Design a protein with these regions (language model features):
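Active-site anion-handling motifs in enzyme catalytic cores
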Residues: 1-331
Length: 331
């Protein structure tokens, strides 16, 4: 809830679907304590927002006494929280992987909820790689919705059942935003995350953007524009890159700004997940850059290459229908 627009896209769809089940209470737990203004539409779909920071330091502790102490404290805290509810729906994301510091607490959450007898729904996830302990925790969930085929293959290949779907952002009700954008066409957008590229190796030559010898984007026929859908994380990094390379930068702070920017572009190059999805739904070419999240980005690349938007939306509905069906029969 820090303002990443991808979270807004997928959570809006998920919470709207959960609302259709007419629960007595629909609470949303997340961080930070004060959500970013961009998340207002998501917050409006929940009855309450519970400030719920995850213990980032846990993943940094060596196994042993320190880690065991944190695990006991976290387990007691989560048991008190989860015992107030009838089901746990884990919000979409790529955090169930051994390289993500959130994984250790998220996997513990699944185990705690399962021990309480609650249905646990992994709603539209990219999962893995995980060690055997992590896979055992994922196996305890009631249902696992894989938002791309790389995760689906990974889980099924290890004997963990999975429902193949597509990201819920494919079902977001995108609307073309009237009015001119901040950049005059023609332009091609480049979305980059600060932890995926080495800024010192970025260069522009003959209208093309490179990282070392790796071609990132070809702007020979149009202007290259740097952009981000997560201003808190990447705006500062991209501002430095933009100054060094003399490229324009647009930091989108709302879904409307993101849609307007992409709808006027000639296409998107992205190592971020949701700008590529937004481009595909709006009918713009989307090139997915591989990064440090192998299942997530490889899976998205395969989805976009092998399916029409209509097929991707059908796949996403399969996941959404599975979530609703699981909750109807389990509660």
């Amino acid at each position: 809830m820090k303002g990443n627009l991808g979270d807004v896209l997928q959570l809006s769809v998920l919470l709207s679907a959960l609302r259709e089940l007419e629960p007595q209470t629909l609470d949303l737990a997340g961080y930070p304590a004060r959500p970013a203004p961009a998340t207002a539409d998501v917050l409006a779909l929940a009855d309450r927002y519970l400030a719920d920071p995850f213990p980032r330091y846990w993943s940094l502790l060596p196994t042993g006494v320190g880690g065991a102490l944190i695990e006991r404290q976290w387990t007691r805290r989560r048991r008190r929280l989860f015992s107030r509810y009838d089901a746990l729906v884990c919000a979409p994301g790529p955090y169930l992987a051994e390289y993500d510091p959130r994984a250790v607490s998220a996997l513990c959450d699944i185990a705690v909820a399962a021990e309480l007898g609650l249905p646990v729904v992994l709603a539209s996830h990219s999962i893995g790689p995980l060690d055997e302990r992590g896979l055992a925790a994922v196996r305890r969930a009631t249902v696992r919705i894989s938002r791309e085929p790389a995760t689906h293959r990974y889980l099924c290949g290890r004997g963990v059942s999975s429902v193949l779907s597509a990201d819920l952002a494919f079902l977001y009700p995108y609307r073309n935003v009237n009015g001119a954008g901040p950049i005059d066409p023609p332009y091609r957008l480049v979305f980059l995350r600060s932890n995926n590229v080495d800024a010192r190796r970025l260069r522009v030559a003959q209208g093309k953007l490179f990282e070392g010898t790796r071609l990132i984007a070809d702007g020979e026929r149009e202007q290259l524009v740097l952009a981000t859908s997560d201003t808190r994380r990447d705006a500062g990094f991209l501002a430095r890159v933009a100054r060094a390379l003399r490229l324009p930068l647009v930091a989108c702070r709302s879904v409307g700004e993101l849609v307007r920017l992409i709808s006027h572009s000639s296409g998107v190059v992205s190592d971020r997940y949701h700008p590529a999805i937004c481009a595909a739904v709006l009918g713009k070419p989307a090139l997915v850059l591989q990064n440090r999240e192998p299942h997530k980005m490889e899976g998205l690349q395969n989805l976009l290459a092998d399916n029409s938007v209509e097929e991707l939306q059908r796949l996403a509905r399969v996941g959404l229908d599975t979530i609703r069906g699981t909750l109807r029969t389990s509660i």
